[in-house]
Amino acid sequence: MYYGFDVGGTKIEFGAFNEKLERVATERIPTQTENYSLLVDDIASLIAKYDAEFGVEGKVGLGIPGMEDAETGALLTSNVPAAKGQFLRKDLEAKIGRSVKIDNDANCFALSEAWDEELKDSPSVMGLILGTGFGGGLIFDGQAFSGYSHVAGELGHSRLPIDAWFHLGENAPLLGCGCGNKGCLDSYLSGRGFELLYAHYYGEQKKAIDIIKAHAEGDVNAVEHVDRFMELLAICFANLFTCFDPHVVALGGGLSNFELIYEELPKRLPKHLLSVARVPRIIKAKHGDSGGVRGAAFLNIKD
């Protein structure tokens, strides 16, 4: 039995999956954002409850909005203040008496897609989230790749390529990022970036959904903005694909619902890739909000 926990800023979602990777239990509880001891106790209590229900000790995986320090094991997270700087994996292991896997929520999202029935034989899957922020996860042979310092897949904090900067024009905005740097992809390719760029070029605040609606209605500014953004995506994605050469790319987050992306990227990408490179298959993520808990559970599949 595989147990997954998607630990968010307001709730913890639990899911249990059997050996066929079918979900057999679901539960949601509020996140203890201020009391770390209660946070650990809540997770441990759910584990004990479902161990008793299924009569086995489930393998435990946690997905978090942050990362674990590769040297110390301390958590780096801002969405769950109680867990910041704490040793959640180690403390939970001590409490339940078994090993626990932990990874960031973007890797869990990617892992969930990689273990979809249709994709599970793909040698490599890249998950990219175009939501409030922009981030990603890298899956090789069914396992999340976290890297030496546990920052592999933090694609949102790679910088805008120089050709993307030129594409944005003479008055291109140098956008700041929450990480303290400027020019991070997170600030440009996210839904937030989509809106910020529109406001920069047209002097008007609009929500992404309204820009997309205006584009469908033929609004001149929206059409120009979407065309510019699609080319920006193609340039930046080509940069990432040249580095990692994934077989499949699964897109999640609010902007992934913009169907034009799946028409435009395959047409625009080739001119930005090496001549010998192939455009990977680009699909919309299938598992939506359940991706985090699925991926957390599947951290243990290859053990």
UniProtKB/Swiss-Prot annotation:
Coiled coil: none
UniProt cross-references to SUPFAM superfamilies, sorted A to Z: Actin-like ATPase domain
Keywords assigned by UniProt, alphabetized: ATP-binding, Carbohydrate metabolism, Kinase, Metal-binding, Nucleotide-binding, Transferase, Zinc
Pfam families the UniProt entry points to: ROK (PF00480)
Keyword ATP-binding in annotation: yes
Entry binding sites for Zn(2+): H157, C177, C179, C184
Single annotated GO MF: N-acetylglucosamine kinase activity
Chain sites annotated for binding ATP: 4-11, 133-140
Enzyme class: transferase
Catalytic reaction annotation: N-acetyl-D-glucosamine + ATP = N-acetyl-D-glucosamine 6-phosphate + ADP + H(+)
Pathway annotation: Cell wall biogenesis; peptidoglycan recycling
Enzyme Commission number(s) of this protein: 2.7.1.59
UniProt-listed GO biological process terms: N-acetylglucosamine metabolic process; peptidoglycan turnover
Family the UniProt entry places it in: Belongs to the ROK (NagC/XylR) family. NagK subfamily.
NCBIfam families for the chain: PRK13310.1
Record function comment: Catalyzes the phosphorylation of N-acetyl-D-glucosamine (GlcNAc) derived from cell-wall degradation, yielding GlcNAc-6-P.
Protein name, entry field: N-acetyl-D-glucosamine kinase
The species this protein was found in: Aliivibrio fischeri (strain MJ11)
